[in-house]
């Protein structure tokens, strides 16, 4: 699903071009339909993580500018965290979006590991008790969260420093419009177990 990475990087580049390589194209090899490519502008980078203050400032700028185009949570195309599909369907509330994302993690766990009564009980508790208690108050009583574009997979392997500018660079994105402090940790849970 290279199209998801291309759309993610295009969205990021539209908001913070100084923080991302410019995406150019994506496609599938004519000679082998199982091989795909993503092409972006070359950025000569260090092997070190960027200055935390500069990276934080760049991500804050992204979250300030990255308004959802339809006011909803989700993303316009499917994206992947490695080989794991990320939930991207449009949702009206953060609670709804996050709940559906967690359900997808549990579905993947069930498919991968089979049925387990403890996991099923944990899923029930998280879906019916934990998420509503933690997230519902963020969007009730006059409070509102505006969905913001997030990278979706920020870690030290997806950030670097541009040698020419000394500015941070972010890449390998799996974007969603989400709570601006979300880092898609629910996908990481599934990825660790796979």
Mark where each language-model region is.
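Hydrophobic HxD+1 residue recognition
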Residues: 154
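An alpha-helical support segment within catalytic cores of ATP-dependent transferases
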Residues: 28-32, 67-151, 162-165
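Hydrophobic "anchor" residues on beta-strands that sit immediately upstream
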Residues: 21, 37, 147-149, 168
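ATP-binding pocket architecture of kinase catalytic cores
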Residues: 1-96, 100
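Hydrophobic residue at the +6 position relative to the catalytic HRD Asp in the kinase catalytic loop
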Residues: 157-159
């Amino acid at each position: 699903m290279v199209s998801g990475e291309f759309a993610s990087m295009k969205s990021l580049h539209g908001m913070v071009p100084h923080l991302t390589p410019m995406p150019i194209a994506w496609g599938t090899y004519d000679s082998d339909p199982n091989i795909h490519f993503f092409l972006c502008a070359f950025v000569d980078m260090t092997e070190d993580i960027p200055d935390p203050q500069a990276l934080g400032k760049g991500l804050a700028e992204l979250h300030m500018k990255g308004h959802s185009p339809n006011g909803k949570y989700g993303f316009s195309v499917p994206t992947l965290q490695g080989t794991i599909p990320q939930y991207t369907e449009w949702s009206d509330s953060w609670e709804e979006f996050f709940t559906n994302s967690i359900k997808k993690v549990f579905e993947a766990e069930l498919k991968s590991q089979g049925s387990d009564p403890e996991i099923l009980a944990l899923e029930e508790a998280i879906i019916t008790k934990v998420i509503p208690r933690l997230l519902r108050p963020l969007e009730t009583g006059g409070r509102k969260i505006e969905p913001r574009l997030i990278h979706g997979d920020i870690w030290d392997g997806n950030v670097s420093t541009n040698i020419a500018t000394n500015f941070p660079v972010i890449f390998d994105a799996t974007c969603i419009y989400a709570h601006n402090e979300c880092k898609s940790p629910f996908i990481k849970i599934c990825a660790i177990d796979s």
